[in-house]
Amino acid sequence: MKRRDVGSLFAGARVAESVPLAPLTTLRVGPVARTLVTCDTTDQVVGVLRELDDRARNGDCGPVLVFAGGSNVVIGDALADLTVVRVANDRVTVDGNLVRAEAGTVWDEVVVATIERGLGGLECLSGIPGSAGATPVQNVGAYGVEVSDVITRVRLLDRSTGDVSWVPAADLSFGYRTSVLKQAEGLALPAVVLEVEFALDASGRSAPLRYGELTAALGMNSGERGEPRAVRDAVLALRTRKGMVLDAADHDTWSVGSFFTNPVVAPEIYERLAAQTGESVPHYPAPDGVKLAAGWLLERAGFGKGYPGDPHARCRLSSKHALALTNRGGATAADVMVLARTVRDGVRDVFGITLKPEPVLVGCAL
């Protein structure tokens, strides 16, 4: 089917029919949406979703998927009659050390805006693809920092009532790569993020540096604070080496980033693993136990960079970073799920640890 623009039907939003979703996601897989509604303002997001949710409750609308950057989602190939609401509101407001970013804002643009204003706290999260609205959903984190460290509140649309309100961070149940906002299947989200507020450091210093690879790159000690722009540059260099900065010409970046989260296990499981391998197992303290490095587990279980090594395979592990499942061109969501299951099951068979996916899976499952 060819894409057909049909004009504006909902709250002034842009509407098109028969739109391939693959080009709108960083993994570049997905079905053709029956309807794509692009919302450029918060009022449009609210108006469109209220209308569509009313229709769905009356049985007059098929499944509705809400997304923005498409960087942390795998959408099943066979989803039919799908209506997609693309959140594209992108205003950023700075008031002293408080920064409010609308949900559709490109995340890295938020980071840049804060650094340009001399605010620290987000520099370690540079280069992460996707939108500002996705960051609280999975409590985005990298290089020793999580967004929950600086989020004060989130503006939400409650889809059951249509109400819009600011919800304090304390009510969002933030955890490792999760929040109360992620506790639902992708087509049944009870609330949609409209805007996020951050409280940042106006002293001109970065967040405390805790990640060994980053402190080494900067020649600093753990716990020290750096100049935010210098920290950003170091983070981008590290991410680029791992294929974690989007580049249309580099298939290693055609991914959702790390596909599996680092597992948190009981101390005795870590001790068993260390005894089993006879190696120094990378690990970090976690509130509920010991956090292991999923990439290390993959490689020790036989799933090294570039697995399965077949140059004709449409989906392979990145040649730069084993945790990234990449589309080498022409892959489908089914191809991604096959490789993900192979890796998950292989790690479980070797180590007795079941890895969990980091992206939101819509219309597909491991």
From Swiss-Prot:
* Catalytic activity, as annotated: UDP-N-acetyl-alpha-D-muramate + NADP(+) = UDP-N-acetyl-3-O-(1-carboxyvinyl)-alpha-D-glucosamine + NADPH + H(+)
* Cofactors that this protein relies on: FAD
Positions annotated as active site in the UniProt record: 177, 258, 358
Per UniProt, subcellular location reads as: Cytoplasm
Q: What are the record's GO terms for cellular component?
A: cytosol
- State its Enzyme Commission number(s): 1.3.1.98
At the top level of its lineage, which domain of life is listed? Bacteria
Q: Pathway, according to UniProt?
A: Cell wall biogenesis; peptidoglycan biosynthesis
The protein's matches in InterPro entries, at most eight in alphabetical order, are given as: FAD-bd_PCMH (IPR016166), FAD-bd_PCMH-like_sf (IPR036318), FAD-bd_PCMH_sub1 (IPR016167), FAD-bd_PCMH_sub2 (IPR016169), MurB (IPR003170), MurB_C (IPR011601), MurB_C_sf (IPR036635), Oxid_FAD_bind_N (IPR006094)
**Which part of the chain is the FAD-binding PCMH-type domain?**
29-203
Q: Keyword set for this entry?
A: Cell cycle, Cell division, Cell shape, Cell wall biogenesis/degradation, Cytoplasm, FAD, Flavoprotein, NADP, Oxidoreductase, Peptidoglycan synthesis
Recall the GO molecular function terms of this protein's record. FAD binding; UDP-N-acetylmuramate dehydrogenase activity
User: Which GO terms are recorded in the biological process aspect for this UniProt protein?
Assistant: cell division; cell wall organization; peptidoglycan biosynthetic process; regulation of cell shape
Q: What is its main location?
A: cytoplasm
Family matches, as SUPFAM superfamilies: FAD-binding/transporter-associated domain-like, Uridine diphospho-N-Acetylenolpyruvylglucosamine reductase, MurB, C-terminal domain
Q: Which family does it belong to?
A: Belongs to the MurB family.
- Role, per record: Cell wall formation.
The protein in question is named: UDP-N-acetylenolpyruvoylglucosamine reductase
Identify the gene encoding this protein: murB
